[in-house]
Amino acid sequence: MSKAIVVFSGGQDSTTCLIQALTQYDEVHCVTFDYGQRHRQEIEIAKELSSKLGASSHQVLDVGILNDLTVSALTRDIPIEENKDGNAIPNTFVPGRNILFLTLAGIYAYQINADVIITGVCETDFSGYPDCRNEFIKSMQTALMQGMDKQLTISTPLMWLDKAETWALADKYNSLELVRHQTLTCYNGLKGDGCGTCPACILRQRGLDEYLANSTMYQAQLAAKCTE
């Protein structure tokens, strides 16, 4: 029996990954992390979506210590700054977040004998976060396998997709409207189309507009990438 764990926030990317995973594995278990994020509504949305979509289980883990150790606009009452310098790390970056999340997901995978951890990180539209890059993911996979003496794959279905192609993937599984209206990506905690002004909303909306303007082209691009 194949088992996978989805690192699940209830946002566009992780929900799209969950929808796909449910077609690929016998059991799909979700894990959500409470790290004191400002957009805390995502935790409740993650609970609702994991149940609605049919995940085998859903765990919410308290990692509030991350908020104690780090200072980020995602966890503190700090204005979210626009990252005008593409080489700079934005102030929404939470240092160590994906290191911690993937480590805990790896421990969970060990306990339930799952061989795959799925995360929605993406290098194409990675917002300047160093822990969303493919090089980091491969390093984490190696560290987890060596540290636990277990065969484990960290799967990143969105790694080389842009936001328009991520919308195409949701549409491929007839879930574009669900992802659009029932997920939470907004840094200000607004469901669906969000506030429209934070960096996450701008990136998400631009991708949606591009996809809707030429869905046939993006579906073809998605199909080509999925067969590479």
UniProtKB/Swiss-Prot annotation:
Pathway participation: Purine metabolism; 7-cyano-7-deazaguanine biosynthesis
Names of required cofactors: Zn(2+)
InterPro entries: QueC, Rossmann-like_a/b/a_fold
Gene3D superfamilies, sorted: HUPs
GO biological process: queuosine biosynthetic process
UniProt keyword Transit peptide present: no
Binding-site positions, Zn(2+): C186, C195, C198, C201
Statement: the UniProt record of this protein carries the keyword Ribonucleoprotein: no
EC top class, as a word: ligase
Cofactor binding annotation: Binds 1 zinc ion per subunit.
Any one GO MF annotation of this record: zinc ion binding
Keyword annotations: ATP-binding, Ligase, Metal-binding, Nucleotide-binding, Queuosine biosynthesis, Zinc
UniProt-annotated binding residues for ATP: F8, S9, G10, G11, Q12, D13, S14, T15, T16, C17, L18
Catalytic activity: 7-carboxy-7-deazaguanine + NH4(+) + ATP = 7-cyano-7-deazaguanine + ADP + phosphate + H2O + H(+)
EC numbers for this chain: 6.3.4.20
Purpose of the protein: Catalyzes the ATP-dependent conversion of 7-carboxy-7-deazaguanine (CDG) to 7-cyano-7-deazaguanine (preQ(0)).
Family: Belongs to the QueC family.
Name of the protein described by the UniProt record: 7-cyano-7-deazaguanine synthase
Organism whose genome encodes this protein: Shewanella piezotolerans (strain WP3 / JCM 13877)
Gene: queC
